[in-house]
């Protein structure tokens, strides 16, 4: 109708102002950055191969291969030998050189690696490389941190097992030089392996003790006794050669023990401790003992 005004258009609720759009975009960007920062956590699951006994699973290796569908994985095929040979550059063994003269053919094939001019008259054996392996004499000798000079050790094997001894030093072969002393527990100067001893927390200060330099591995090496040969008329009279302690051993034993005994006597109850023999009784567990 004439004179009437058209109703004003209502603002669209779905449309947003530019300021609100900018805030919305910022919020989305923040959410994206937070999502990127947080690593996706996979769902924890137990093994597909339940354990029957410790170290033994329910399914075999071939069964697990099919259960895990490992056959679907794609592996790069290894390069064939022919492809490897193609890539390798051939090292030339000979070179062709020009030669002067009309009747010499123009070129000559010459070896790059020339043969020796002289040969040895006798065959000399060559020493083969051992590829980093060293002989036993050059092996690194390591010592347990608990074993230091003056430590009381408990011997676990041999004729003196269970006895307590004093550690003196480590020899070049890696064996330990120990002594009883002889007057306390009848253990002489002898070698023993660090595998077969228990290091106790009891220690003696032997920094002032002078150990003879000739007490080496060669000194303690056992000499082979000669076997008696049967001769006519002496079949029953022959006797086996017996091992006898040399005078040098006796002198060295006294020299070392005379220096260690005063230091043992200075500590109360240490003499009785060295005389006693280590043994386990009922209810005593070695892994729970503090030595």
UniProtKB/Swiss-Prot annotation:
UniProt subcellular location: Cytoplasm, Cytosol; Cytoplasm; Rough endoplasmic reticulum
UniProt cross-references to PROSITE patterns, sorted A to Z: RIBOSOMAL_L6E
Gene3D superfamilies according to UniProt: 2.30.30.30
SUPFAM superfamilies to which the protein is assigned, alphabetical: Translation proteins SH3-like domain
Pfam families xrefs: Ribosomal_L6e, Ribosomal_L6e_N
Main location class: cytoplasm
Function per UniProt: Component of the large ribosomal subunit. The ribosome is a large ribonucleoprotein complex responsible for the synthesis of proteins in the cell.
Designated name of the protein: Large ribosomal subunit protein eL6
Organism phylogeny: Eukaryota, Metazoa, Chordata, Craniata, Vertebrata
Gene symbol of the encoding locus: RPL6
């Amino acid at each position: 109708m004439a004179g009437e005004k058209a109703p004003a258009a209502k603002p669209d609720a779905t449309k947003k102002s530019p300021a609100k759009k900018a805030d919305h975009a910022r919020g989305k960007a923040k959410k994206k950055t937070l999502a990127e920062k947080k690593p996706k956590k996979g769902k924890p699951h137990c093994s597909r191969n339940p354990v029957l006994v410790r170290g033994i699973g329910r399914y075999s290796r071939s069964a697990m291969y099919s259960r895990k569908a490992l056959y679907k994985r794609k592996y790069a095929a290894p390069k064939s030998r022919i492809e490897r040979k193609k890539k390798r550059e051939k090292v030339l063994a000979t070179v062709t050189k020009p030669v002067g003269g009309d009747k010499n053919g123009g070129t000559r094939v010459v070896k790059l690696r020339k043969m020796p001019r002289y040969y040895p008259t006798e065959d000399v054996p060559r020493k083969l490389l051992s590829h980093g392996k060293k002989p036993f004499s050059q092996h690194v000798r390591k010592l347990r941190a608990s074993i230091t000079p003056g430590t009381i050790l408990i011997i676990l094997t041999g004729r003196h097992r269970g006895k307590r001894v004093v550690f003196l030093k480590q020899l070049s072969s890696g064996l330990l030089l120990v002594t009883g002393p002889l007057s306390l527990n009848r253990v002489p100067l002898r070698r023993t392996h660090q595998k077969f001893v228990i290091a106790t927390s009891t220690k003696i200060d032997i920094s002032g003790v002078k150990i003879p330099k000739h007490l080496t591995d060669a000194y303690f090496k056992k000499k082979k006794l000669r076997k008696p040969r049967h001769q006519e008329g002496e079949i029953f009279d022959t006797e086996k050669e017996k091992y006898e302690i040399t005078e040098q051993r006796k002198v060295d034993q006294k020299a070392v023990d005379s220096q260690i005994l005063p230091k043992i006597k200075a500590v109360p109850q240490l003499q009785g401790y060295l005389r006693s023999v280590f043994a386990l009784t009922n209810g005593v567990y070695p892994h729970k003992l503090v030595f």
